[in-house]
């Protein structure tokens, strides 16, 4: 599995480093060095992580986004027995929830889309799924946590109302982790953050997460098969790949492009 970074040679990449935040960081396929649809690419040894035959290659393609979820989990400081609220069951939200479940954390997902709610149920990554169009999420969370609120909340939508819900659903001294990449300014209820002494944290990509992520899959703690929603030929890349993701992304989690089909 390739950790698809382009990092300057003088940047430390060992344990404890933050190479993912380094100057001029970029990604293979976006910033050069070939791309994932190339027949072959050359990758520096540092960015290649071995996998066993316990992980089929099509599922191995999901290690990269799963590592995003793992890094968000690490940033949260969540531990076994905690209760987490995941705001949004898109691809990253679902994979994050899978990591949390594998780590022994009780997961509550809030999601509007029926297709995404169904996928969360199918994948078994949530203990509870709440639809904000049907229930008051904060009130339901309080009922599920003996009136206390969750230990950690993950915002995965870039929607301000969801961020507001994450803040209000937290117990005092909880963590709010912002997972999504916002293209627009957001507001946050600073009064709630202060009065409950909440920690608000960002998370981006991954940093020394791949090895532990691979281990979770190889040990059978995460099954990636449910997250592959479609396999397409290379000549279907536009119509069944990009256009589906642009116009009908609620039905897609991860689409595998296989030139050999």
Residue ranges and their predicted role:
Residues 180-197, 208-210, 215:
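Rossmann-fold NAD(P)-binding glycine/threonine-rich loop
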Residues 170-172:
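Helix-to-beta-strand junctions that scaffold the AdoMet/dcAdoMet cofactor pocket
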Residues 1-48:
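Glycine-rich phosphate/adenylate-binding loop and adjacent beta-alpha elements
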Residues 164-168, 207, 211-261:
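C-terminal hydrophobic helical "lid"/dimerization subdomain
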Residues 136-146:
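Short amphipathic alpha-helix with an adjacent loop that forms part of the alpha/beta core around
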Residues 108, 177, 201:
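Conserved beta-strand positions in the Rossmann-like core of class I SAM-dependent methyltransferases
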Residues 55-134:
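Mid-domain Rossmann-like dinucleotide-binding core that forms the NAD(H)/NADP(H) cofactor-binding site
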């Amino acid at each position: 599995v390739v950790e698809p970074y382009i990092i300057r040679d003088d940047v430390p990449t060992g344990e404890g480093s933050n190479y993912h935040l380094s100057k001029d960081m970029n990604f293979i396929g976006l910033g050069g060095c070939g791309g994932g649809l190339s027949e072959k690419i050359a990758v520096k040894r540092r960015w290649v992580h071995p996998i066993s035959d316990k992980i089929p290659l099509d599922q191995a393609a999901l290690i990269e986004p799963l590592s995003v979820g793992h890094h968000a989990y690490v940033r949260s400081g969540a531990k076994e027995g905690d209760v987490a609220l995941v705001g949004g069951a898109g691809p990253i939200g679902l994979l994050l929830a899978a990591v949390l479940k594998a780590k022994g954390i009780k997961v509550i997902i809030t999601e509007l889309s029926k297709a995404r709610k169904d996928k969360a149920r199918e994948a078994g990554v949530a203990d509870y799924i709440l639809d904000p169009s049907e229930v008051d999420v904060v009130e339901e969370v309080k009922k599920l946590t003996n009136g206390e609120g969750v230990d950690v909340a993950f915002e995965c939508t870039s929607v301000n109302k969801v961020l507001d819900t994450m803040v209000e659903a937290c117990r005092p001294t909880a963590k709010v982790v912002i997972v999504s990449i916002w293209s627009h300014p957001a507001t946050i209820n600073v009064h709630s953050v202060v009065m409950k002494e909440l920690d608000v944290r960002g998370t981006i990509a991954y940093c020394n997460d791949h090895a532990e992520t691979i281990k979770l899959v190889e040990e059978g703690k995460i099954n990636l098969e449910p997250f592959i929603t479609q396999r397409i030929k290379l000549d279907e890349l536009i119509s069944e790949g990009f256009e589906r993701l642009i116009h009908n992304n609620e039905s897609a989690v991860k689409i595998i492009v296989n030139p050999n089909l």
